[in-house]
From Swiss-Prot:
Residues 1-370, 385-427, 673-720, 738-775 are annotated as: Disordered. InterPro entries: Plus-3_dom, Plus3-like_sf. Residues 225-239 have a biased composition (Basic residues). PANTHER family: RNA POLYMERASE-ASSOCIATED PROTEIN RTF1 HOMOLOG. Residues 169-224, 306-330, 338-360 have a biased composition (Basic and acidic residues). This is RNA polymerase-associated protein Rtf1. The modification Phosphotyrosine is found at residue 384. GO terms for biological process: Notch signaling pathway; positive regulation of DNA-templated transcription; positive regulation of transcription by RNA polymerase II. The gene is Rtf1. The modification Phosphoserine is found at residues 49, 51, 53, 269, 271, 385, 388, 390-391, 412-413, 415. Residues 604-665 form a coiled coil.
Amino acid sequence: MGKRRTQSLIDSNSSDSDSESETNLESDLMSLAKKRKKPQTAAKSSSRSDSDSDWANNKAGAPSSKKKKRQKPSRDSSSSESNWDDDSQDERQPARQSPAQTQQEHKPPEQASQPAQLSEQEEGEVSDSDSDKSKSNSSSSGSDSSSSSSSSDSEFDDGFDDDLMGDDEDRRRLNGLSEKERETEIYKRIEQREIMRTRWEIERKLKLARRGEKNQEKSKNKGERAKKKKEKREKKARKAREAQAPLPTQASTSTLLDVEPKPSNEVRSASPLSTPALNRDAASTSAAVASIMPDDAASSAGVSDYFDHKERSKERKKNVEANKTDDKRSNAMALLKAKREGKAKREEEEAKRMAEKDRDDDKEELDSVSGCKSAVKLKASEIYSDDSGSSDWDEEEKPAGKRSRSNSSKASSESEDEEKAPQRPVFITTREDLNKLRLSRYKMERFVNLPIFESTVLNCFVRISIGNNGQKPVYRVAEIVGVVETGKIYSLGTTRTNRGLRLKHGTQERVFRLEFISNQEFTENEFNKWNEVCQQSHVQMPTIDLIAIKQNDIKKALNYEFKDEDVDKIVEEKNRFRNRPTNYAMKKTCLMKERDAAMLRGDYDIAQDLGQQIDELENRASELDKRRSHTLNLISYINDRNRKKNVEDAEKAILEEARANKGLKISDPFTRRITQPRMGFKGAKKDEDDMQLAPLPPPPPGKKRPNEAGTSSASVRSTDSKDYSLYSLHDFDIDLDVPLPVNTNSVPKPASKPAETVSKRSLNLEDYKKKRGLI
């Protein structure tokens, strides 16, 4: 049913549009083939001819079994040519009644004319138009497939929508999850989408690149195929002329022009699109024969009866196979011949160039000899050269011109040699010039950690200490010839290093540490000593040019910009030469972490080594702590001793004071006293003045005056202050005679206690001395 539907569709299309081209028919066939996938297992298992017949079968709508049955004799033709001819004649009658005949009857005039043209093509030939049609068909199918693939590749699809959800089942599953699980799943899908999108973009770019390469290859192959077709046509025409040349003209005309017309309704096993190539071949062969054969119709008719159709088909088949093999052989031979010719040409050119070079060298040698410039003899190779097509006069003029050119080139080369001749080196002869190459210890401290330290200090000079002569140090001028590492780590300024310099003094070389380099300049005696040693040892002195070079190196080292790698290297080197870590606690913590990690990994040896390092670090830290706290302990001991001594001295002073006072209370003017404020009035002061102005009554007999009594009372008071016994306290005299005032009329007012206006605490120095009895 499928085959009938296809045939009916083709017939309807052909009947509706008679002017439709063959390309539209092919596009319709391709669309039908895409809509209905037809199994092609039989076509895949068949040979190359079967695949071509299947394509023709799909186009004609005939069953593939009949095609296979019709093409079977053509496959057996390689074994026996006679059987192939008989079978082909026997199969012509069934082929005429095939469905292709009925289809051809309904085709437009353009398609119906094709079987008539097919009759002119002989069996066994493959036309160019057939291959072109098949290629166009494959290219159209390829373009369709590429367009479909490009359309599929133009959009990225991972099976989820914009909300990162799939079908309804996936939505229900996500809705059934908790919010946290849903967000986690969506986040995973986002990451997966990014990965897949990146991979898809990379694959798309690769596909586009492959398509571009394929298109370039196709365009190149098309050009090559067109070129090969052109060459084949030319070779066929040439071979046809060569093949027809030895034969009689009548025979050649009969073989080429005696073509029996075949019925138009016959469908050949080859493609019906091969007629244009046959027409082109026939035209070329007829044109080639037209120049050879005479225009005689009777002779051509007589020769045509001599050849049979079978003989002619066999000969044509042999010619086709011979053309194929000859093309390959001729191409291979042409390539091999071209390679050999190119190689021979290159060898010949190389030989010519070497010969010319030898001739020029010989001429220069002859010209350099005095008196031989006019007597230059030419070699036989120069006169009888194979590549010289000029006359004898040219050959005679050529050496003269060459001699003149060689002379001029020699003169120019001599002038250039004089200009390029190296100037005589100027050596250092003064101490000032040598001091420009000197490096001090301060600069060594700055350069020792630089990556360019060795290249900077090489060929420089230093003032090195070699020992003492009595109590005076001895220095020598030495040249730096190398940088080495010594076995001792020493301090150089603020850094520690183990580098040393290999120094040269005359012919002697020794290694010195950087700490022995002097900062002072060379003295005159040291310079003279070094100069004398160099002359005796035949050592070349440094040149003036070396000064500029080394000064540039030193300047570059002073302005060197450190990189991250340089800083890491310097830090590592300083840590290697440091006696102890900068932070014991951090170092111990790092070692403990490494030890725990090694224990978890099972590396017990490494853990044991790390434990030993931790113990050593703790021991070193404890030693440093003792050394640091030793001075602190001495100071604290001295402070404690002084404190105890002060306490003892204070106690002794207290005891002595107590022993001196003997329990007496001594008023100290500098101690605080309890005081009470009192109000003072002027009236009381006037009363005191009046009492002082009043005359005192005479003392009773046996009594002293008040002044005397005051002195005596003061003395008693002083003695009483010293003696506090009851007897002394009650041992005092009472004066019963009271003196009366002079003015009897005045009634004395009640005496009020005089107010002390001055505080007891306010004592001047004189009162204090009086109170102490110092005055």
